[in-house]
């Protein structure tokens, strides 16, 4: 299935400024993410950034990327990666049914299999009822369940998201043994696939109170009654780089996996 990967690459980060230029085994993180994207069947990769520095670094690597990769400067006042992608979609005038993969610039451990999984959801017979496709993986460590930097998701029996939160969801009462319940919690992996016509609807919605409280833009989708399908994949050790500590862990895992 034809799909285009767009990587929103904002330079500023309140918890880790300039993280997209942080070193991952000898290369800036944004370059590592692009390299991962190139292992997929995508027809095009667009880096959407508000940073001249990021743009120059990506352009410097053009010779090794081939003609699949482009980088575009965007406005700096976008409140989310989805808003930044919307600017690019309008600029390129993609067709309404074009599938877009929103790949975060701080996901250097992402795999082609994970990306293909969220795209393949749109081949399902029930895909007409799905607005957005994303991923999750079981959590097996208590410190991750209570970590507000790790977003949790609860799904129904059909794999549809009920809620996303930085808090521990579902809550476990004192009548349960945590060690016996490990694996019921799901860690959200922040990559998304959707069609351009969904993005047009999304941009017409205002921020919901839940989105403001949790600082999670995907809650705007649930608030407006649309469906997010969550593919649950086991044995994924994917880490978003949000802090210097997570950068250290990613460097260790990247060295092992490569």
Curated annotation (Swiss-Prot):
Gene Ontology terms: biological process: CMP-keto-3-deoxy-D-manno-octulosonic acid biosynthetic process; lipopolysaccharide biosynthetic process
Reaction(s) this enzyme catalyzes, per UniProt: 3-deoxy-alpha-D-manno-oct-2-ulosonate + CTP = CMP-3-deoxy-beta-D-manno-octulosonate + diphosphate
GO CC terms of this entry: cytosol
Known pathway: Nucleotide-sugar biosynthesis; CMP-3-deoxy-D-manno-octulosonate biosynthesis; CMP-3-deoxy-D-manno-octulosonate from 3-deoxy-D-manno-octulosonate and CTP: step 1/1; Bacterial outer membrane biogenesis; lipopolysaccharide biosynthesis
InterPro entries: Cytidylyl_trans, KdsB, Nucleotide-diphossugar_trans
GO molecular function: 3-deoxy-manno-octulosonate cytidylyltransferase activity
Principal subcellular localisation of the protein: cytoplasm
The protein's Enzyme Commission number: 2.7.7.38
Reported function: Activates KDO (a required 8-carbon sugar) for incorporation into bacterial lipopolysaccharide in Gram-negative bacteria.
Family according to the record: Belongs to the KdsB family.
PANTHER family tied to this protein: 3-DEOXY-MANNO-OCTULOSONATE CYTIDYLYLTRANSFERASE (PTHR42866), 3-DEOXY-MANNO-OCTULOSONATE CYTIDYLYLTRANSFERASE, MITOCHONDRIAL (PTHR42866:SF2)
NCBIfam families: kdsB, PRK05450.1-5
Name this protein carries in UniProt: 3-deoxy-manno-octulosonate cytidylyltransferase
Annotated source species: Blochmanniella floridana
Top-level taxonomy: Bacteria, Pseudomonadati, Pseudomonadota, Gammaproteobacteria, Enterobacterales
Gene this chain is encoded by: kdsB
């Amino acid at each position: 299935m034809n799909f285009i990967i767009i990587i929103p690459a904002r330079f500023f980060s309140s918890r880790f400024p300039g993280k997209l230029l942080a070193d991952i085994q000898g290369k800036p993180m944004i370059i590592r993410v692009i390299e991962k994207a190139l292992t997929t069947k995508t027809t095009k990769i667009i880096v959407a950034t508000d940073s001249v520095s990021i743009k120059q670094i990506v352009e410097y690597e053009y010779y090794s990327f081939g003609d699949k990769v482009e980088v575009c400067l965007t406005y700096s006042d976008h409140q989310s990666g989805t808003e930044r992608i919307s600017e690019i979609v309008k600029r390129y005038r993609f067709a309404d049914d074009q599938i877009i993969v929103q790949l975060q610039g701080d996901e250097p451990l992402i795999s082609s299999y994970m990306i293909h999984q969220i795209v393949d959801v749109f081949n399902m017979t029930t895909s007409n009822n799905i607005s957005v496709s994303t991923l999750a993986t079981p959590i097996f460590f208590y410190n991750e369940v209570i970590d507000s930097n790790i977003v949790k998701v609860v799904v129904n029996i059909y794999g549809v998201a009920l809620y996303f939160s930085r808090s521990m969801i579902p809550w476990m009462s004192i009548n349960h043994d945590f060690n016996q319940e490990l694996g019921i919690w799901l860690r959200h992996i922040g990559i998304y696939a959707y069609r351009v016509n969904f993005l047009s609807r999304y941009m017409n919605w205002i921020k919901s109170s839940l989105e403001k409280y949790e600082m999670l833009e995907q809650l705007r989708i649930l608030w407006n009654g649309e469906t997010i399908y969550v593919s649950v994949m086991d044995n994924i050790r994917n880490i978003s780089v949000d802090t210097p500590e997570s950068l250290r862990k990613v460097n260790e895992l990247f060295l092992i996996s490569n």
